């Protein structure tokens, strides 16, 4: 007998039960269910047996009530030590066809052809999508509300779950050691003061860092070697945003294609983003960004004077000199 569950609640006039590997007699189970549900004005009951290949017997039951129950005890339907799987019957005709496929079924009462309307079904799906907070919870809610879809379309449901709740990517590990790289004194000061700062200092908005320089000089390699970060190249998508990162990297993305640039550059906290194929979410933020670009896509050339004012107030700007590189060894070519 399962332990009591505070979360269990059955409020459906149409119920589908399955008793796996049950050694009881079908007629005894039938009589038990009919008497148990009489207070709820039962008007149809069907109990069918199914012989599995392993030689065990499963019993299925379709229950139709005239009065909606509110059952909080998960052991309510337990019979002779057998606990059933309990599901709302979304489509009574479909359930009846399924349980009677072997022909061994006992019924009583007048069957009603019932199924959830498409509008109500859409509303249930919408609720699941809007309220689930993780992939596991999303799939569990579907299994509870739509067991048939869960059993027959799990592969597609997992695909949608991964879109809504994408797995966190593996943390980047730099292939270079600290001795392989070097940086300008200004960048060293920014790193030590604003990136490797004392985390106990709260309420401080640290400036971001803007580096504009030629290709193949090690800008990306150096930036990615500094610690745990979010990395965006080509486009910004918050789907896999890492809340535990200590900084962001915006690499080779033109200024006009950077959404929420003030929030990212200004080290702002608690702002709402809209990931691709996902639902809006609030991210903690509060971390600086490193912007990397080549001279042909210098952000300053695309900004208005007001945008430049905000940018310069919230960002340390570094234009690389001729011959400047982030590699300490000439043999490096990344």
UniProtKB/Swiss-Prot annotation:
> Where does this protein reside within or beyond the cell?
Host nucleus
Q: What is its EC number?
A: 2.7.7.-, 3.1.21.-
Keyword set for this entry?
ATP-binding, Covalent protein-DNA linkage, DNA replication, DNA-binding, Endonuclease, Helicase, Host nucleus, Hydrolase, Metal-binding, Multifunctional enzyme, Nuclease, Nucleotide-binding, Nucleotidyltransferase, Repressor, Transferase
Question: Could you cite one Gene Ontology molecular function of this protein?
Answer: helicase activity
Q: Which residues bind ATP?
A: 213-220
Write out the GO biological process terms. DNA replication
Motif, RCR-1: chain positions: 16-19
Chain intervals for the UniProt region annotation (Transactivation):
236-254
Q: Motif location (Nuclear localization signal)?
A: 276-286
Where in the numbering of this chain does the CRESS-DNA virus Rep endonuclease domain appear? 9-111
Top-rank taxon, per record: Viruses
Please give the GO cellular component terms listed in this UniProt entry: host cell nucleus
The protein's required cofactor(s) are namely: Mg(2+); Mn(2+)
Outline what the protein does. Essential for the replication of viral ssDNA. The closed circular ssDNA genome is first converted to a superhelical dsDNA. Rep binds a specific region at the genome origin of replication. It introduces an endonucleolytic nick within the conserved sequence 5'-TAATATTAC-3' in the intergenic region of the genome present in all geminiviruses, thereby initiating the rolling circle replication (RCR). Following cleavage, binds covalently to the 5'-phosphate of DNA as a tyrosyl ester. The cleavage gives rise to a free 3'-OH that serves as a primer for the cellular DNA polymerase.
Q: Which family does it belong to?
A: Belongs to the geminiviridae Rep protein family.
Q: What is this protein called?
A: Replication-associated protein
């Amino acid at each position: 007998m399962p332990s009591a569950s505070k979360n269990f609640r059955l409020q459906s006039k149409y119920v589908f039960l399955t008793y796996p590997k049950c050694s009881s007699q079908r007629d005894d189970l039938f009589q038990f269910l009919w008497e148990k549900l009489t207070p709820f004005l039962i008007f149809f009951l069907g109990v069918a047996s199914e012989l599995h290949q392993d030689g065990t017997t499963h019993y299925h039951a379709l229950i139709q009530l005239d009065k909606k129950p509110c059952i909080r005890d998960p052991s309510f339907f337990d019979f002779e030590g057998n606990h059933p799987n309990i599901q709302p019957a979304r489509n009574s005709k479909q359930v009846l066809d399924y349980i009677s496929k072997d022909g061994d079924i006992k019924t009583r009462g007048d069957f009603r052809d019932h199924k959830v309307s498409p509008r109500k079904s859409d509303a249930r799906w919408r609720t699941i999508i809007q309220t689930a907070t993780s992939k596991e919870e999303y799939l569990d809610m579907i299994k509870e509300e739509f067991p048939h879809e869960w059993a027959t379309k799990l592969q597609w449901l997992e695909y949608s779950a991964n879109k809504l709740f994408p797995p966190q990517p593996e943390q980047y590990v730099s292939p270079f050691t600290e001795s392989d790289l070097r940086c300008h004194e200004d960048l060293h000061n920014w790193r030590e003061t604003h990136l490797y700062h004392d985390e106990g200092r709260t309420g401080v908005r640290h400036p971001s860092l803007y580096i504009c320089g030629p290709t193949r000089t090690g800008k990306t390699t150096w930036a990615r070697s500094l610690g745990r970060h979010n990395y965006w190249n080509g486009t910004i998508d918050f789907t896999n945003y890492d809340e535990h990162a200590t900084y962001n990297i915006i690499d080779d993305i033109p200024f006009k294609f950077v959404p929420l640039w003030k929030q990212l550059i200004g080290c702002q906290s608690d702002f709402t983003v809209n990931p691709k194929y996902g639902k809006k979410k609030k991210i903690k933020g509060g971390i600086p960004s490193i912007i990397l670009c080549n001279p042909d896509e210098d952000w300053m050339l695309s900004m208005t004077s007001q945008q430049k004012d905000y940018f310069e107030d919230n960002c340390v700007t570094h234009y690389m000199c001729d011959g400047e590189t982030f590699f300490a060894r000439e043999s490096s070519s990344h």
